Amino acid sequence: MRALVLLIRPYLPGGRLMDHFYSASNAAYHAAKEMADRIAAECGIRAERCSNLKLKPMCRRHPSFGTGKNTLNYLPGIGSRFCMELLGLSEPVDTESDAPYPKGELPCGDCGRCAAACPTKAITADGFVKERCIRFHMMSGKPMPEEMRGLVGSDAGTRGVLGCDICQRVCPANTEIEKYRTAEDAFTLEELLECTGDTLERFAALYGRNYANRNRILAQAVLAAGNHDPEKYREQIQQLAQSPSPALSEHAQYMLKNMKK
């Protein structure tokens, strides 16, 4: 490949059960593939999506991007609320403008809002500790650490089933775009707890096939249900406690045990 094209897709923050980043990321993935096909057809050059390159560390070296203490990339005007895709081209493509990109400065200094807001203290003075991040353990197929289970579906924690954006919500660099936050979700908690074939298909279409794993969805949903309204969902949690899935059954049994306290 002789040229690289970085595609940026901004999105509006929101979602309670499912963070809007994940649907935006899936949409960006498909848009990048369509763009590659279009470049190949209209420009007569080979174009393909580069999935083997890590974009976050690449962007840290580019002056247009800032980097937060949460290790996320930031851009002027949209903060950290964007998805990235990279295309590799066999030949450079003429651009309409050579205007310089705005410099992305992120004066974190001694702000510390993200570190103070993180419920698991994953952002420290020495850097970001991914093993402490709730998102790191979500939908992994393994049981979440016990100290994190009470935070799923809780206003004090992630509030949802997939995604934790607390550090982004409180960041001053996201102040403007946070004005457009919505609580809209594509699924209800009841739908996720049932997780029918239709729900899985919709889930795959919106978030991607990689996330459409029934047991992994249920393992997160049962924690959210138990923390949100344990009595309302007790019967469903009891049924899921018999699941052959280790993570799902352990999460359900944990919630039932803690309901009795």
Predicted regions and their residues:
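Iron-sulfur cluster-binding cysteine motifs and their immediate structural context
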Residues: 113-138, 157-184
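Structural detector for internal amphipathic alpha-helices that build alpha-solenoid repeat scaffolds
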Residues: 218-228, 250-259
